[in-house]
């Protein structure tokens, strides 16, 4: 599972996830990409599940890049615990996603294969996505 090796602080404020992705919004490494079209959070488990799906579909061909990293801790209090007594423990890690953010990139495979792999992977993610192709070399 993806998570930071160490952080300055253990817990984080909830914050707001609005606006568009100004960085990480172009196909930079590969030939094809999976781009987010909505706001949301991707958990480390979702990122890994989609990665496995893509890897299984393309088999040995192609190279893949994961363009997001879950660096925000989400806390949760134990079940049947009364309110108060501080913030809960870190339960999992998420990557905050804005519309336009590139999530995965791939190269070295035919477009039909890439399109199908990303379609299968998109079913594992909690944000709506679209398939994009590199425009400028």
UniProtKB/Swiss-Prot annotation:
Lineage summary: Bacteria, Pseudomonadati, Pseudomonadota, Gammaproteobacteria, Lysobacterales
GO molecular function, one term: structural constituent of ribosome
Family: Belongs to the universal ribosomal protein uL16 family.
PANTHER family reported in the protein's UniProt record: 50S/60S RIBOSOMAL PROTEIN L16 (PTHR12220), LARGE RIBOSOMAL SUBUNIT PROTEIN UL16M (PTHR12220:SF13)
The protein's name in its UniProt record: Large ribosomal subunit protein uL16
HAMAP family in the cross-refs: Ribosomal_uL16 (MF_01342)
An example Gene Ontology biological process: translation
Subunit structure: Part of the 50S ribosomal subunit.
Gene from which this protein is expressed: rplP
Entry-linked Pfam families: Ribosomal_L16 (PF00252)
Superkingdom of origin organism: Bacteria
GO CC annotation: cytosolic large ribosomal subunit
Task of the protein: Binds 23S rRNA and is also seen to make contacts with the A and possibly P site tRNAs.
InterPro entries attached to this UniProt entry: Ribosomal_uL16, Ribosomal_uL16_bact-type, Ribosomal_uL16_CS, Ribosomal_uL16_dom, Ribosomal_uL16_sf
């Amino acid at each position: 599972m993806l998570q930071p090796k160490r952080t300055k602080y253990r817990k984080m404020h909830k914050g707001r996830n609005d606006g568009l992705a100004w960085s990480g919004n172009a196909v930079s490494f590969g030939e094809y990409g999976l781009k987010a079209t909505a706001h949301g959070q991707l958990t480390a488990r979702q990122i890994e599940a989609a990665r496995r799906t893509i890897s299984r579909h393309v088999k040995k061909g192609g190279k893949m890049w994961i363009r997001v990293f879950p660096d925000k801790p989400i806390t949760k209090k134990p079940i049947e615990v009364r309110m108060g007594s501080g913030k809960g423990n870190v339960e999992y890690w998420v990557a905050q996603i804005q519309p336009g953010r590139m999530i995965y990139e791939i190269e070295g495979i035919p477009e039909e294969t890439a399109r199908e792999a990303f379609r299968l992977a998109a079913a594992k993610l909690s944000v709506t996505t679209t398939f994009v192709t590199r425009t400028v070399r």
